[in-house]
Amino acid sequence: MPQLRDSGTRSLHATEPVPSAEMDGFCRIFGVETEYGVAVTGAERPVDAGQVAMTMFQPIVSRSRSTNTYLTNGSRLYLDVGSHPEYATAEARDPREALAQDLAGEHVMRNLALKAQRKLRESYGAHATIHVFKNNVDSAGHAFGCHENYLVRRFVPLETIEHQLLPFLITRQLYTGAGRMTPDGFQITQRADFLDEAVSSATTRSRPMVNTRDEPHADPDSFRRLHVIIGDSNRSQWSTWMKLAVTHLVLCAIEDAFRHGTPSGFEHCAFADPAAANRTVSRFLDDPHAELTLESGESVSALGLQRRYYAAVKAFIETHVDALASSLPATTIDTIMGEWSRVLDALERGAYDALADRVDWAAKKRLFDALKRRRPDVTFAQMEQLELDYHDIANGRLYGSLVARNQMRELLTGDNVEYAVHNPPTDTRAALRGRFVDAALNVGAQFSADWTHLTLTAPERREAILLDPFEAEPTLGFEQLMEALN
């Protein structure tokens, strides 16, 4: 195996290359990282959010001696900078599986919050309530993220990601944006006012839309991990699934173009000013026909540019039907394209209410519009509270009531989510990681893990390296590790 050349450390040594069997096709690894916001209301005295987050993670620390751990479903659970609980899904081959793992993260966070709430009430009163927000901006204006991860063939240059993919990522927010009420009006995205660069390797001193730090968590000679920052955290299951699914198809077209030296159809889509275009798209409802300036000097609306991407992807699919069909185990290409076409048609008609059962911003807009009709004197602060309730996965009621009244589509059942809480995807290396973590916990062994390593730290150190994220079959090193564990 080659040396793993991640940024920061490129210290994984091995003896021979292990090329992935999936390098030549369109199969992909998907992942979603979600940072959650934490707040407390009803306490008899002030409670620090960091203290609440640590209380939530106390069961994790007791079990793993750390606030950074991997779970039996292969996912990562940890406290991020600023006391934001974060959940990173296990590697998935299909958007539907990635959605299940993301919802499992909601389930885990909700359980941690409700257990911590019971403990908190012993010291802060019976009405102390923990809120865990799956959103991207808090009431003080601090932004935090939802990051998508896509494994991309390394022969695609980063410049192409910026020029051909980024315009798609910006304009897909027409149907994947979570929406946000601001003092100046309603925006269809949460983070447009906070993202200031197109691409960058930094995430602290700048806020890029795509992060280029080279950490593939795979064979670095074959793949790069595309780290998308621009997306919102979604409550809608459809939106989470859709943003992964359509982005996969666009990436397939880009990869195929570079593989064969042919045009992708996206060569002339780059924005002259991506940050300005992003802010304009976020204010789509102010002017749905607002023109965005391309590098070429041409102007096009956000919807018009999405139509171009749709047409190019449709033409690409017609000549790659079988290869694309085999790239996704649980999602059909016809389903993705049908949903994409219908949502673009609804946007063109201005039929935003027709999207309210699947698009977060449309659902929230319908709620706000109905509230303003009933109560013309409603204040911004009251609408802000309503919005926070929509995103509260611990004690919020609004989103659940929409689901209960069949006003929000669900793609997965409660049983699907419960299964994903305890079980990793079976067709990626997450299956091996989950098996190892489960066995180590059962015998009380000291261990550590990351995306490419599994380590037994005592009584003697043993390690297995899992460099291929597509490979779910045990390696010799993994089998030896499990023997030592047992």
UniProtKB/Swiss-Prot annotation:
Record field: catalytic activity: ATP + [prokaryotic ubiquitin-like protein]-L-glutamate + [protein]-L-lysine = ADP + phosphate + N(6)-([prokaryotic ubiquitin-like protein]-gamma-L-glutamyl)-[protein]-L-lysine
Keyword Transport tagged: no
GO molecular function: ATP binding; ligase activity, forming carbon-nitrogen bonds; magnesium ion binding; ubiquitin-like protein transferase activity
Positions with a binding annotation for Mg(2+): 33, 78, 86
Positions of the catalytic residues: 80 (proton acceptor)
Biochemical pathway: Protein degradation; proteasomal Pup-dependent pathway; Protein modification; protein pupylation
GO biological-process terms attached to the record: modification-dependent protein catabolic process; proteasomal protein catabolic process; protein pupylation
EC assignment: 6.3.1.19
Keywords associated with the record: ATP-binding, Ligase, Magnesium, Metal-binding, Nucleotide-binding, Ubl conjugation pathway
Function as written in the Swiss-Prot or TrEMBL entry: Catalyzes the covalent attachment of the prokaryotic ubiquitin-like protein modifier Pup to the proteasomal substrate proteins, thereby targeting them for proteasomal degradation. This tagging system is termed pupylation. The ligation reaction involves the side-chain carboxylate of the C-terminal glutamate of Pup and the side-chain amino group of a substrate lysine.
Protein name: Pup--protein ligase
Organism, scientific name: Bifidobacterium longum (strain DJO10A)
Gene label: pafA
